[in-house]
Amino acid sequence: MFGRKQSPQKSVKNGQGNAPSVYDEALNWEAAHVRLVEKSERRAWKIAGAFGTITVLLGIGIAGMLPLKQHVPYLVRVNAQTGAPDILTSLDEKSVSYDTVMDKYWLSQYVIARETYDWYTLQKDYETVGMLSSPSEGQSYASQFQGDKALDKQYGSNVRTSVTIVSIVPNGKGIGTVRFAKTTKRTNETGDGETTHWIATIGYQYVNPSLMSESARLTNPLGFNVTSYRVDPEMGVVQ
């Protein structure tokens, strides 16, 4: 009897065959996906690291530039004769106090106004010295312009005396020492004139500016007031 032939079974190949199974394909896809994710994460970390490095470098650069943006105050002196500004020194809050700076300023202004003789600015200097002086010291200064031998009558517009401040040392106790040079020459001369060197010892104080007139406060807003003034030739300097 011929029996029914059995139909051949389609073989399904596994990992040991030539064709991959559905299971193997799934494993391969998952492994490839994992590698792709790991590669993407490594790339992201590299980019983040690069940005972090750039941020640190920018911070260092900005910190290095901060000293360049620092505002350093300077004491500027304006020449009373020419109006030219002159930077004397930088001011360090740790080494130079505000009171010292102001004392030096007013002491220099006083000596310049009192020792300068210029026919064309004489009235202004005269008024400035009066406003910055006590009554007795102001009278002592004014006396040189009184009588037949008054300084303005002797010099007129023919002589000019200019002042150069050499150094100022306030001791913080109401006494200051100012070293200065005076150059005197006739206005019709072309030479350098005669220069002499002096030391002024000045007693001073600050009075309440509210007790002063408005015009005086415009010239002397802090109430600087000279109570004594003595000038001596500087020893050891060729006059």
From Swiss-Prot:
Entry keyword set: Cell inner membrane, Cell membrane, Membrane, Transmembrane, Transmembrane helix, Virulence
One Gene Ontology molecular-function label: identical protein binding
Induction: Specifically induced within macrophages by phagosome acidification. Induced at 37 degrees Celsius in minimal medium, suggesting that nutritional stress is a regulating signal.
Matching InterPro entries: NTF2-like_dom_sf, VirB8, VirB8/PtlE
SUPFAM superfamilies xrefs: NTF2-like
Mode of membrane association: Single-pass membrane protein
GO cellular component: plasma membrane
Keyword Zinc-finger in record: no
Predominant place of localization: membrane
Biological process (GO), any one: protein secretion by the type IV secretion system
Membrane spanning residue stretches: 47-67
Subcellular location: Cell inner membrane
Function noted in UniProt: The VirB system could be required for the establishment of the replication niche in the host.
Family membership: Belongs to the virB8 family.
Note: Transcription of the operon is maximal in early exponential phase.
Protein name: Type IV secretion system protein virB8
Organism name: Brucella suis biovar 1 (strain 1330)
Gene: virB8
